[in-house]
Amino acid sequence: MNIDLINWISFAWQALLKNRDWMTWNLFLAVLPWALSLWLFGKPRSRWLRWGVVSLTVATFIPHASHALQSSLYILKYIKTSYLIWAIALTAVLMGFDRWKLKGARSRSLLWWLGFLVFIAFLPNAPYVLTDIIHLVEDIRFYDSIWLITLILIPQYLIFMGLGFQAYVLSLMRLGTYLETRGWKRFVVPAEFIVCALSAIGIYMGRFRRFNSWDLVTQPDRVVAITMDDLASQRPFWVTIVTFAVITGLYFLMKWVTESIGLAQQSRSMAVLSNK
């Protein structure tokens, strides 16, 4: 009996390790915009939250540091002139609008806008983790142990997808909070819908066309051309619409849950202070 248990634990551990590499990499890509939001939109009050985000980002990055370095070198080697022109032009337009809107006061720097473009480019990687459920289906078909599937694989995937999508929710919520502090509260909901729409397009292009975020740098012309061509086709268009509906619905649901938890914690803290 003990030998069987040890063998099962060893088998379960191997099943966990089988998904470790791609899960940690996808989770790093999902958490990266959240980490960027700490710099772009201001530090959160909770020190534990700040350290938690940084720790999770570092923990998911370290196993893939060499891969990330190779990707960075690839981008630098094959970066397109058209992308540089497009990025500089877009950044200049955004900075000009920012200075005009704020009359030069508290306007953001070039570095900030470049960071914001990276934030938007990588943000679709967070809800993208929901599509990794196809790997769970493959694992269920591969393994014949109901206990392994129920006790190990399903919890592993739920934690992975939950962390990734919650990173998306918190990143977008921080963007909304930032807009509110700048006096642009009326733009929060439209911005959320726009980001969800861009994320839906990014998810489709990533899952079906196998593009990734750095393809926007190395082959922007091809990405734009194929995206426009696909959106003009019926099947890709409706797949994108359904994806948009799913991630938008889940986002607002999880936003409500997150805000409710935050309000409950504030009420509890105020109650404790009033009793002292």
Locations of regions flagged by a protein language model:
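A generic, lipid-embedded transmembrane alpha helix
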Residues: 57-69, 116-133
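Hydrophobic transmembrane alpha-helical segments in integral membrane proteins
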Residues: 5-30, 75-84
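Central hydrophobic cores of alpha-helical transmembrane segments in multi-pass inner-membrane proteins
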Residues: 26-42, 54-64, 83-100, 173
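Transmembrane alpha-helical segments in integral membrane proteins
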Residues: 31-42, 95-99, 162-179, 244-266
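Membrane-interface transmembrane-helix boundary segments in multi-pass integral membrane proteins
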Residues: 15-24, 151-153, 212, 222-249
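Hydrophobic alpha-helical membrane-insertion segments
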Residues: 113-124, 191-209
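Membrane-interface helix-boundary motifs at transmembrane edges
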Residues: 40-51, 99-111, 177-186
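Juxtamembrane non-transmembrane "cap" segments at the membrane-aqueous interface
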Residues: 201-223
